[in-house]
Regions:
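Catalytic cores of DNA base-excision repair glycosylases
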Residues: 1-128
Length: 128
């Protein structure tokens, strides 16, 4: 674990996640992945240090569940093109994607990657 400012907090959060993996699924990721998405999401959100985005990152990228990840890039792009208000909440923005895109993990993964790529290249924090 490389320090990125708050290494003690990061270590505590990683320990909490490891404890969850051990207690919840006996360290069996496949067993964890077989749980229903929303049930697993609720359990992940109970873990110290895991919020909406991190829970959804784990569900989509690590476990292959069809759930859309909302991050700063997603918020920025959707606001700039006039789809949402600047301060839109996570569930509302996530529902926009979940309700209008095919419910497919690979599709969500690729769609989000394209948002990130576009935001890094053309939709920067401070427009030029």
């Amino acid at each position: 674990v490389y320090p990125s400012g708050y290494y003690n907090a990061k270590a505590r959060k990683l320990k909490a996640l490891c404890k969850f993996l051990h207690d919840f699924c006996e360290d069996d990721i496949d067993r964890m992945a077989s749980r229903p998405t929303q049930e697993l999401r609720i359990e992940l959100l109970r873990v110290y240090g895991i919020g909406n985005e991190t829970a959804d990152d784990i569900l989509l990228y690590a476990l292959g569940h069809p759930i859309f990840v909302v991050d700063t890039y997603t918020r920025r792009l959707m606001h700039r093109i006039g789809v949402v208000e600047e301060r839109v909440n996570y569930p509302k923005l996530q529902a926009l994607f979940m309700d209008n895109l095919p419910s497919d993990a690979q599709y969500f993964n690729e769609f989000h990657a394209l948002i990130v790529r576009h935001s890094v290249v053309a939709c920067k924090k401070s427009p030029e």
